[in-house]
């Protein structure tokens, strides 16, 4: 099968490597490279199957500038919420392509370990279960794939866990110990589920690979960019310097503002996200911790 991966960052490169095991693959590049597997955006749009691994905040602009109403089937591997429109990825892509040609990839998966061909399990969500199964068949045997109808739940989990990973990184950056991190992540899972309930996401999604699985991975490892952002914030650095030092995109930073705006709009109780936003804006990490410890909790 011919598949083009759009986005040549770490995640896009890892997906290209995995999908190349069983398929004829190419990957887009924004720079001139003398490598046969790199193709231009125009060439990529000629492929029947596309896998998007772009930074979430850049996807709408990419679609406006490049997308033509062809018959591609698309797997979205980007995790985030568009900050300008406060739309989830299915809504962003839905402006350009029908939902029966869209699937979404989620689950615990560090790009570096996928490149090392270490085993992992992922979820492919979509309204068209035949297409989900088709995309699932493209992956090699060291990546176990499941399918799901709960697009919104998978999207919320994939976006929200990045913000919770920032909070977890702060916790570890302050050397508060394993008990504190476990408490924070557990409360974060409850908060993420509460947010998802408003959007009619399915409860089982939050307890599976897309939810608890991805959250526990991202919130407990220095391989996570968002976790490293939190750890740096705990040391007293401002977010501008943290991101310069990181040198990579940390989706959780922009996603925190998007979730915060949505929670205010719909009056959803999200204390951890609220404190992450305040820390991004300069609030002392210790003060945020104290406020979280004294905040009310609707569900334990």
Swiss-Prot record:
GO terms for biological process: carbohydrate metabolic process; glycerol-3-phosphate biosynthetic process; glycerol-3-phosphate catabolic process; glycerophospholipid metabolic process; phospholipid biosynthetic process. It is found in: Cytoplasm. It catalyses: sn-glycerol 3-phosphate + NAD(+) = dihydroxyacetone phosphate + NADH + H(+); sn-glycerol 3-phosphate + NADP(+) = dihydroxyacetone phosphate + NADPH + H(+). One of its GO terms (cellular component) is cytosol. This is Glycerol-3-phosphate dehydrogenase [NAD(P)+]. Pathway: Membrane lipid metabolism; glycerophospholipid metabolism. GO terms for molecular function: glycerol-3-phosphate dehydrogenase [NAD(P)+] activity; NAD binding. Its EC number is 1.1.1.94. NADPH binds at residues 11, 33, 79, 111, 225, 249, 251. The keyword Lipid biosynthesis applies. Keywords: Cytoplasm, Lipid biosynthesis, Lipid metabolism, NAD, NADP, Nucleotide-binding, Oxidoreductase, Phospholipid biosynthesis, Phospholipid metabolism. The gene is gpsA. PANTHER family: GLYCEROL-3-PHOSPHATE DEHYDROGENASE, GLYCEROL-3-PHOSPHATE DEHYDROGENASE [NAD(+)] 2, CHLOROPLASTIC. Disulfide bonds: none annotated. The active site is at residue 161. Belongs to the NAD-dependent glycerol-3-phosphate dehydrogenase family. Its main location: cytoplasm. The keyword Aminoacyl-tRNA synthetase does not apply. It comes from Campylobacter lari (strain RM2100 / D67 / ATCC BAA-1060).
């Amino acid at each position: 099968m011919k598949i083009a991966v759009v986005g040549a960052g770490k995640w896009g490169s890892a997906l290209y490597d995995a999908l190349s095991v069983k398929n004829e693959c190419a990957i887009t590049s924004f720079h001139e490279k003398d490598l046969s597997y790199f193709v231009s955006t125009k060439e990529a749009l000629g492929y029947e199957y596309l896998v998007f691994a772009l930074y979430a905040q850049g996807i709408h602009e990419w679609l406006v500038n490049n997308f033509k109403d062809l018959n591609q089937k698309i797997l979205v591997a980007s995790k985030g919420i568009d900050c300008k429109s406060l739309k989830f990825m299915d809504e962003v892509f839905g402006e350009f392509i029908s939902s029966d040609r869209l699937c979404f990839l989620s689950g615990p998966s560090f790009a570096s370990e996928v490149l090392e061909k270490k085993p992992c399990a992922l979820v492919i969500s979509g309204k068209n279960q035949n297409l989900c199964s088709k995309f699932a068949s493209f992956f090699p045997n060291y990546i176990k794939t499941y399918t799901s109808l709960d697009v919104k739940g998978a999207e919320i989990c994939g976006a929200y866990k990045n913000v919770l990973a920032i909070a977890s990184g702060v916790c570890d950056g302050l050397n508060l110990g394993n008990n504190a991190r476990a408490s924070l992540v557990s409360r974060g899972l409850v908060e993420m589920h509460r947010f998802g309930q408003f959007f009619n996401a399915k409860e089982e999604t939050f307890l599976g690979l897309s939810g608890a699985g991805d959250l526990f991975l991202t919130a407990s490892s220095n391989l996570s960019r968002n976790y490293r952002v939190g750890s740096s914030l705990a040391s007293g650095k401002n977010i501008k310097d943290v991101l310069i030092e990181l040198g990579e995109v940390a989706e959780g930073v922009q996603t925190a503002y998007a979730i915060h705006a949505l929670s205010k709009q719909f009056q959803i109780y999200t204390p951890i996200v609220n404190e992450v936003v305040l820390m991004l804006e300069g609030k002392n990490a210790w003060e945020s911790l104290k406020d979280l410890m004294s905040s009310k909790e609707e569900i334990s």
